[in-house]
From Swiss-Prot:
InterPro entries: BRICHOS_dom, Chondromodulin/Tenomodulin. Residues 105-201 form the BRICHOS domain. GO terms for cellular component: endomembrane system; extracellular region; membrane. Residues 212-270 are annotated as: Disordered. It comes from Mus musculus. It holds the Pfam family BRICHOS. Bifunctional growth regulator that stimulates the growth of cultured chondrocytes in the presence of basic fibroblast growth factor (FGF) but inhibits the growth of cultured vascular endothelial cells. May contribute to the rapid growth of cartilage and vascular invasion prior to the replacement of cartilage by bone during endochondral bone development. Inhibits in vitro tube formation and mobilization of endothelial cells. Plays a role as antiangiogenic factor in cardiac valves to suppress neovascularization. SMART domains: BRICHOS. This is Leukocyte cell-derived chemotaxin 1. Disulfide bonds join C132-C193, C282-C286, C283-C323, C293-C317, C297-C313.
Amino acid sequence: MTENSDKVPITMVGPEDVEFCSPPAYTTVTVKPSGSPTRLLKVGAVVLISGAVLLLFGAIGAFYFWKGNDNHIYNVHYSMSINGKLQDGSMEIDAVNNLETFKMGSGAEEAIEVNDFKNGITGIRFAGGEKCYIKAQVKARIPEVGTVTKQSISELEGKIMPANYEENSLIWVAVDQPVKDSSFLSSKILELCGDLPIFWLKPMYPKEIQRERREVVRNSAPSTTRRPHSEPRGNAGPGRLSNGTRPNVQDDAEPFNPDNPYHQQEGESMTFDPRLDHEGICCIECRRSYTHCQKICEPLGGYYPWPYNYQGCRSACRVVMPCSWWVARILGMV
């Protein structure tokens, strides 16, 4: 059997055919890695510099923001003697948001009171308590003051102030049911209360105060039926309980009464809303601060007259400043 393929003898392979028999030649090529260390270092340096610049601008912005807000926020720390026990207290006034915050005690005995003058709400919370309390507050209508005497209260810093209680002082008792819709409350009050149920507080007058109020109404009733010849600009109406450390002051039908010492103008003709004084926000005639304590109690559901309708009272104390200083702080003039 003959083979169709032709065989080439080895001896007939010439030099020109050697290149077809030798293995292919490889050229040495230097290949640079895709991620060069120099390039990575440059990228890292750019990232670090950019981050440092951002941090620098952030720090500068935060500094100026803090510096701007610091001009409108005032803090003072003091001590208060309550029933012979010394407790720390602090007061913070936020002029921008019309907020006033008082803290008394520490730990399980801490009480926090936030006065939201913009919305007319006061929030009170006790440490370890299961409820948060709110009550109606006067909306601060800051009057226009031409010249204000700048009163320094540096003496209040670190001072020990006695907290005096009156037997017949006003008592605040929580209602039976919590607030269902809290959308009307400000973010500061909601932050204070957190997840606790919120209860309205209603004023409760002891028997002695109720008797005095009835006598005031009875005595003032004849004066409303006849008009005297020389009548002052403001007629006295039913009495309203004043601040805890001062005697009762009758409420006024008109905003100013020259016969009422709490409405007398001070040295530089500075006038204030009388409700600021009546609600215990500040003291019109005072030249120095004083303490004001209020009792927050739980309803008992018993007979209405005192003391059968409340229980479990706790105290929340604060410092009442002179109205001239208080208004000046809110206006940012001190």
